[in-house]
Amino acid sequence: MDRKTLDDTSKFLSYVLRHQPEAIGLTLDGEGWADIDALIAGAARDGRALDRMLLGAVVENNDKKRFALSADGQRIRAVQGHSHAAVAIAYAPAVPPAVLYHGTASRFLDSIRERGLVPGSRHHVHLSARRATALEVGRRYGSPVLLEIDARDMHLAGHLFHQAENGVWLTERVPVRFIREA
């Protein structure tokens, strides 16, 4: 399977499994799961050729582990990053490491300094335990800036953290007082 096919399919899956399942007539359950046969049929109606082998390759080879297959192999979901109102994955609370990181573009700094980190259209703010990963995310949006989050103090102050299956740390918001430009 060539890299371009995997990347294009990953982008398509991110769109329909995180944000717009209706675009192909797909229904997600409350945990974000979609029936694979319905996904394949919806993609075909949209002019996209998907099959179980391609979906398995995307799940297996995605460097950020964005997708998961159910134990029975009949369903697929994005593990985090949802903006769809019907999806509310019940992540277990987790104790974060002392410091987490968030990558952003410099053009967003004024808003972050004023409001902190907010999820925007997503359900959660996404954080990383690795500086390099956070910087990579920031590069997608422009000139990258690395923010250091005092996750220990934030957690002690009562803010909940969760860790998605792919290792991404999630929280509802990050108040300004817990953010430092690294």
From Swiss-Prot:
One of its GO terms (molecular function) is tRNA 2'-phosphotransferase activity. Keywords: NAD, Transferase. Pfam families: PTS_2-RNA. InterPro entries: Ptrans_KptA/Tpt1, RNA_2'-PTrans_C, RNA_2'-PTrans_KptA, RNA_2'-PTrans_N. Its EC number is 2.7.1.-. Gene3D superfamilies: 3.20.170.30, RNA 2'-phosphotransferase, Tpt1/KptA family, N-terminal domain. GO terms for biological process: tRNA processing; tRNA splicing, via endonucleolytic cleavage and ligation. It is an enzyme of class 2 (transferase). The keyword tRNA processing does not apply. It comes from the Bacteria. Belongs to the KptA/TPT1 family. Removes the 2'-phosphate from RNA via an intermediate in which the phosphate is ADP-ribosylated by NAD followed by a presumed transesterification to release the RNA and generate ADP-ribose 1''-2''-cyclic phosphate (APPR>P). May function as an ADP-ribosylase. This is Probable RNA 2'-phosphotransferase. It comes from Pseudomonas aeruginosa (strain ATCC 15692 / DSM 22644 / CIP 104116 / JCM 14847 / LMG 12228 / 1C / PRS 101 / PAO1). The lineage of its organism: Bacteria, Pseudomonadati, Pseudomonadota, Gammaproteobacteria, Pseudomonadales.
